[in-house]
A protein has these predicted regions:
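Calcium-regulated, polybasic anionic-phospholipid
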Residues: 36-59
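Bacterial Sec-dependent N-terminal signal peptides
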Residues: 14-39
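An anionic, turn-rich surface loop/hairpin at beta-sheet edges
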Residues: 81-99, 114-136
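C-terminal partner/receptor-binding element of secreted or periplasmic proteins
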Residues: 117-165
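Mature extracytoplasmic domains of secretory-pathway proteins
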Residues: 55-110
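Extracellular and analogous surface-interaction loops
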Residues: 23-25, 70-79, 149-164
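Sec-dependent bacterial lipoprotein signal peptides
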Residues: 1-20
Length: 165
């Protein structure tokens, strides 16, 4: 069975409201989007779920019924590695039972806790709205679909994990 390629977009992980200092010891929100490209009949062959850890020992699992699939505004603590996996389990009627997991690490690198970074300064961090995050994700999805971005490395340790051609 051909493996599906997973593009994980960690995007720019952003504080959505409040000053950065107030989030130092609190959960904050991130937006994650990833796009799956593969067999057209994948949803007839597999039960697909996404599993991710919130960094505090809690594991969340949700079904994936279409792509691109987004986990938006999921609560995660600051400065942790978030383990994300997409699991493909063959449906019962499939004779050739083959399952696999695609996993990626998304390093939560919060500019706002480090006095600014390449995209957002500390003073800008709290000004970014949920609408802007949605616009960012939609723009990235469009660029991926147009082939303007490609996966840099399956282990995502930078801001987006994508490099522009």
């Amino acid at each position: 069975m051909k493996k599906l390629s997973i593009l994980l977009l960690t995007g720019t992980l952003l504080c959505l409201s409040g000053g950065c200092d107030s989030y130092r010891n609190r959960d904050t929100r991130i937006a994650i989007s990833y796009l799956c490209v593969g067999q057209d009949d994948m949803f007839e062959l597999y039960d697909i779920t996404a599993t991710y850890s919130d960094g505090k020992g809690r594991v969340h699992t949700s079904p994936v019924t279409s792509f691109p699939w987004k986990v938006e505004y999921s609560y995660m603590p600051l400065g942790v590695h978030a383990q994300l996996e997409i699991n493909f389990q063959p449906k019962p009627h499939i004779v050739r039972k083959e399952s696999y997991t695609v996993g990626c690490n998304a390093y939560i690198n919060w500019d706002c806790l480090q006095g600014g970074g390449e995209n957002y300064s500390e003073t800008d961090c709290y000004k970014i709205s949920a609408e802007e995050v949605d616009a960012f994700l939609n723009d990235m999805d469009r660029k991926i679909a147009e082939g303007k971005y490609k996966l840099k490395n399956p282990s995502i340790t930078n801001k987006s994990g994508f490099v522009q051609d």
